[in-house]
Curated annotation (Swiss-Prot):
One GO CC term, this protein: extracellular region
Naturally occurring in which organism (per UniProt): Conus tessulatus
Keyword set, alphabetical order: Amidation, Disulfide bond, Knottin, Neurotoxin, Secreted, Signal, Toxin
Residues of the signal peptide: 1-24
Pfam families linked to this entry: Conotoxin
Protein name as catalogued: Conotoxin TsMSGL-2
InterPro entries, A to Z: Conotoxin (IPR004214)
Free-text note on domains in this protein's UniProt record: The presence of a 'disulfide through disulfide knot' structurally defines this protein as a knottin.
Taxonomy, superkingdom: Eukaryota
Amino acid sequence: MSGLGIMVLTLLLLVFMATSHQDAGEKQATQRDAVNVRRRRSIAGRTTTEECDEYCEDLNKNCCGLSNGEPVCATACLG
């Protein structure tokens, strides 16, 4: 095989390796985000109303329950 053929095959191999590595990183990030959402929503076993969930979702937070009839929103509900 000529030197040019070997260089082309090497280049194709490097491109393949680089793209598969990028895809793996993207897949890992997607899986990590999915796990974080699952954990965030299930930290506390509180019962919430649909109104509270919708109100807090608009603020990009989780409904942690009601206090004096008002929704309590937080990034992570503790206890």
